[in-house]
Amino acid sequence: MVEGEILSWAEVQHTHRIRNGVYQRAGRLISLLTDFGRINPCYPDTHADATGETILYTGAGRRGDQHLTPPNRALLAAIESGHCVPLFNKLAPGRWQHMGYWRVADAIHRFDERENRMLWQFTLKKMKGDG
């Protein structure tokens, strides 16, 4: 996969084997999906700066307060391990863009007034090269 490449869901599924945004196995983060809130507004992921090198990624859990579920625990554990994972951005049904490799750098569990619930927010940092 090349950063920026447009992929089908079948191609994304070679890496990200589930439909949920956080794919993990045995507590280790494998890959992430986003749509930057365009399709699923309950996941309001955003670029944190104009450079595009930092993303504020919303944790797992569509309704109600987000808790330390296995996907959110895997995101937290990735801060400690420091490993990089691929991020795929949904452009439209069946069209995904490979966004390169990202490292989970930080996390905060906070009340989001707009969503009226507790959310996990993870800071993703863009990695140079192929991850």
What annotation goes with each model-predicted range?
Residues 1-96:
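Acidic, glycine-rich low-complexity segments with interspersed aromatic residues
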Residues 92-131:
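Compact mixed alphabeta submodule
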